[in-house]
Amino acid sequence: MIKRFWSLSDYHHEVEEVIAHHQHMKQVPSDYDAILDIKMLEEYIELVDKKVLIDSVKLFESMIPDYIALMEANMIAQDQKGLVEEAHKIKGAAGSVGLKRLQLLAKQIQTPTLPAWEDNVQDWVDELKQEWRHDIEVLTDWLQNY
């Protein structure tokens, strides 16, 4: 009788989907933890609203290319003050939407008193430039699954 409503092949397919989903979720949290400030995001959604956070992420996504372009221009011009100012803006904006890795990179860039800062700052700028899109994708994925 059950077979009439739920065939064995349907059952196997459903089990495979559940297993695949659980395997995916086992891999994803490490990405989430490295890239996102999960506690902050959960509190933000609880206090304000998920839609407000999504709107903030969209605003960040639209503004960061300009911040990065200015940061790169300041690197070329060897304008440490300008570089630090742009990195500070990125740090604040990234932190406000829970993008922990970008926030920490920007914090390093904005802190010329760090040991070997001059030797590392270009690498940090390059990493920020390379990773921001991916980090926003991870955040968007997290928000969709929250």
Show the residue positions of the predicted features.
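Two-component system phosphorelay core
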Residues: 1-85, 89-146
